[in-house]
């Protein structure tokens, strides 16, 4: 949702979705950049 100052605050459901994606995605990006 959007906070009063206009920033976007992730909800609990958003964190449950994005945290696993971040944990899985960061090593994938790192490997792709390393072995390109």
UniProtKB/Swiss-Prot annotation:
Q: Which GO terms describe its cellular component?
A: light-harvesting complex
List the keywords (alphabetical): Antenna complex, Light-harvesting polypeptide
Superkingdom of the source species? Bacteria
Tell me the function of this protein: One of the components of the bacteriochlorophyll-protein complex in the chromatophore membrane.
Protein name from the UniProt record: Light-harvesting protein B-1015 gamma chain
């Amino acid at each position: 949702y959007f906070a009063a100052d206009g920033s976007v605050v992730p909800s609990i459901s958003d964190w449950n979705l994005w945290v696993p994606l971040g944990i899985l995605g960061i090593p994938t990006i790192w490997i792709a950049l390393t072995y390109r």
